[in-house]
């Protein structure tokens, strides 16, 4: 799966751009502020309906316009899909796939699975559990079609339950919601656990390449003691939850834990090793997607040279290319990428002041 055409209009500092990317490695280079990261951001926006740099859509729309427009042709083997998105300054989003209006942004994510590696990516290991749950849930969403609705039901019931807790109602008025919460929570947890187990198998081989002297253990925590019946726990913790005004245990508290020996990876590994670990997680997730669905992710890699030394830059690029996925990499100096490859990039683009120009024949300097 790959983008064969990308049209960007009034997106950040790009007034209008038309790209015809290769299905291999696409190198996008230019000075800071030129708009090269905006190209990656536009692809992400097209697949997720939001930016990886800002949740405020108004900031990505050029100030003199009231909307942004993104359009792409997507090759799926012998089939081709067309995806179009408009985001208005009012916040309204209009999405079409093959001419049909789409109401749910989750349909975009299913159609265009995207992996992002940026200088901020390793915050996955330092931020709270929410970002790691989102990482798990990206994979769970793609691996099991029942996950999206089950997790939506969990969130809906939790919202209702928390409101009842704040109103300090009797437990008998909450019991019905607890039964529903248990039912959907067990399904969500099962899908998450199975996904993490499968991801762990993919991750082992990649970590051997990236961190050969380190043994990283990955485990999934469900958000409550696995030896405890969740329904009984909700009843037992009812008074505590009333006092807090929210539900203290459940799948909304799940986490992905990574350790070296008895230490969290944050305490055991260097900053450079942590970056490599996050890259390994993203590659493993993409490989697992391919194994489970026969669909490749599209990889967006921003500012790679500043994050890794030459040896590990070469190793990461080779691992990415071995996935067979379409890759977009940005850099200030194209030589830093070209010199790390055994063969030149499939296609190169130069970006200057929001203007994107294709470089037909990439060569080593």
Swiss-Prot record:
One GO term describing the cellular component: cytoplasm
A Pfam match: SMC_N
Keywords: ATP-binding, Cytoplasm, DNA damage, DNA repair, DNA replication, DNA-binding, Nucleotide-binding, SOS response
Any GO BP: DNA synthesis involved in DNA repair
Annotated InterPro entries: DNA-binding_RecF, DNA-binding_RecF_CS, P-loop_NTPase, RecF/RecN/SMC_N, RecF_2
Keyword check for Repeat: no
Domain of life: Bacteria
Any one GO molecular function term: single-stranded DNA binding
Gene3D superfamilies: P-loop containing nucleotide triphosphate hydrolases (3.40.50.300), RecF/RecN/SMC, N-terminal domain (1.20.1050.90)
Subcellular localization, as worded in the UniProt entry: Cytoplasm
Residues annotated as binding ATP: 30-37
Main location per the UniProt record: cytoplasm
HAMAP family xrefs: RecF
Family: Belongs to the RecF family.
Role, per record: The RecF protein is involved in DNA metabolism; it is required for DNA replication and normal SOS inducibility. RecF binds preferentially to single-stranded, linear DNA. It also seems to bind ATP.
Protein name from the UniProt record: DNA replication and repair protein RecF
Lineage, uppermost ranks: Bacteria, Pseudomonadati, Pseudomonadota, Gammaproteobacteria, Alteromonadales
Name of the gene encoding the protein in the UniProt record: recF
């Amino acid at each position: 799966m790959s983008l064969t055409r990308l049209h960007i209009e009034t997106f950040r500092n790009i007034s209008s751009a038309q790209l015809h990317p290769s299905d291999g490695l696409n190198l996008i280079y230019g000075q800071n502020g030129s708009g090269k990261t905006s190209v990656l951001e536009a692809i992400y926006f097209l697949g997720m309906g939001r930016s990886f740099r800002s949740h405020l859509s108004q900031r990505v729309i050029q100030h003199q316009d009231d909307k942004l427009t993104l359009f792409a042709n997507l090759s799926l083997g012998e089939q081709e899909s067309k995806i179009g998105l408009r985001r208005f300054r009012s916040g309204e989003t209009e999405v079409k796939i093959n001419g049909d209006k789409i109401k749910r942004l989750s349909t975009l994510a299913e159609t265009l699975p995207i992996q992002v590696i940026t200088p901020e990516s390793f915050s996955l290991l330092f931020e709270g559990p929410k970002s790691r749950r989102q990482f798990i849930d990206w994979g769970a969403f793609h691996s099991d079609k029942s996950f999206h609705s089950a997790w939506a039901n969990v969130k809906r019931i939790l919202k209702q339950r928390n409101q009842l807790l704040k109103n300090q109602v009797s437990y008998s008025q909450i019991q019905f919601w607890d039964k529903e919460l248990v039912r959907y929570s067990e399904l969500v947890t099962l899908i998450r656990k199975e996904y993490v187990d499968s991801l762990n198998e993919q991750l082992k081989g990649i970590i051997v390449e990236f961190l050969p002297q380190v043994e990283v253990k990955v485990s999934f925590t469900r958000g409550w003691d696995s030896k405890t019946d969740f329904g009984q726990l909700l009843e037992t913790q009812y008074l505590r939850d009333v006092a807090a005004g929210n539900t203290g245990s459940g799948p909304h508290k799940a986490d992905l834990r990574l350790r070296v020996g008895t230490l969290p990876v944050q305490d055991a590994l260097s900053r450079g090793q942590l970056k490599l670990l996050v890259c390994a997680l993203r590659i493993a997730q993409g490989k697992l997607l391919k194994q489970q669905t026969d669909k490749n992710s599209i990889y967006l890699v921003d500012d790679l040279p500043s994050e890794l030394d030459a040896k590990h830059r070469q190793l990461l690029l080779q691992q990415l290319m071995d996935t067979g996925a379409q890759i977009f990499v940005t850099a200030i100096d194209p030589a830093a990428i070209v010199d790390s490859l055994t063969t030149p990039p499939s296609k190169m683009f130069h970006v200057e002041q929001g203007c994107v120009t294709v470089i037909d024949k990439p060569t080593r300097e």
